[in-house]
Amino acid sequence: MGQKINPIGFRLGINRTWDSRWFADNAEYGQLLHEDLKIRAYLMEELKAAGIAKVVIERPHKKCRVTIHSARPGLIIGKKGADIEKLRKKLSEMTNSETHLNIVEVRKPEVDATLVAQSIAQQLERRVAFRRAMKRAVQSAMRLGAEGIKITCAGRLGGAEIARTEWYREGRVPLHTLRADIDYGTAEAETAFGICGVKVWIFKGEILEHDPMASERRATESDNQGGGGRDRRRENA
């Protein structure tokens, strides 16, 4: 089962937590769920250049709090915070409620599965050789502390007439071990020959305590230990 299921969904409530953190009754649950989907789709399209790793949505008492994890937060914030204010107003219109916006910097994008998948997809669209893009991503992740990584690319790779799947793996990626901290991300590359799919699994070590927030807390501590840059976390009320 661990080989087929989404590794993040498999570990929810064990060492991972949900990206949508709110409760609702049956009457409004569907509406709020669709709002979340629209918000994520809008942010992923609008902020494509900012490298969005994930979007966390919380809804405390008829308000909405959106936390964007980004590799390039400066592109979201803009000059003197002008862009982030426009974005906050747009999200307020979409949710019909007061919206707060937080920006959190991802200081090690090389070990974030979603950002790695997006990077490989962008390289495929620029006609970079898929083997070179995959090997470079594997080497960068292992150099920056990943204990294991697996990448698969599927589609008409290199313009071949018959679609196929190619993969690389280095280190351990124990998908069936629930205490393993596995990050998983996907992306699509729209090439001239059709769409190529990219999947990335990154093993960051084991989490022994039973805590749904453990993975998120561990990622924050790892970013803080990385040093070098100033804290780009910003809250816009």
Curated annotation (Swiss-Prot):
Keywords: Ribonucleoprotein, Ribosomal protein, RNA-binding, rRNA-binding. NCBIfam families: rpsC_bact. Pfam families: KH_2, Ribosomal_S3_C. Part of the 30S ribosomal subunit. Forms a tight complex with proteins S10 and S14. The gene is rpsC. Residues 213-237 are annotated as: Disordered. Residues 39-107 form the KH type-2 domain. The keyword Cell membrane does not apply. One of its GO terms (cellular component) is cytosolic small ribosomal subunit. This is Small ribosomal subunit protein uS3. It comes from the Bacteria. GO terms for molecular function: mRNA binding; rRNA binding; structural constituent of ribosome. SMART domains: KH (SM00322). GO terms for biological process: translation. Binds the lower part of the 30S subunit head. Binds mRNA in the 70S ribosome, positioning it for translation.
